[in-house]
């Protein structure tokens, strides 16, 4: 390789990424191959449910739909190439933003109270 080709070399991270064992089994099992054949015939979408938000997205997961638990429900996440290296939990938010409090003044003593809506 010459100096001109240095920019084309992919940079690899030496850290070991965690992936839950049940996710690897679900992605590589023979059942998955059978489901792929059924998907082509009947247009069935297979979703893999997981509670493992700390699992890293690996290239094996590209094109799959993984339902990530956010504490209340499973959020379906379609895995793309740009997501590789991130954690599954980053794509299923756990908190709901309800905005800032609305402040009102009462006529009796002119104090300001925060009201929750």
From Swiss-Prot:
GO cellular component entries: mitochondrial small ribosomal subunit; plastid
Pfam families: Ribosomal_S19
Keywords: Plastid, Ribonucleoprotein, Ribosomal protein, RNA-binding, rRNA-binding
Compartment(s): Plastid
SUPFAM superfamilies associated with the record: Ribosomal protein S19
One of the protein's GO biological processes: ribosomal small subunit assembly
Biological role stated in the UniProt entry: Protein S19 forms a complex with S13 that binds strongly to the 16S ribosomal RNA.
Protein family according to the UniProt entry: Belongs to the universal ribosomal protein uS19 family.
Protein name stated in the entry: Small ribosomal subunit protein uS19c
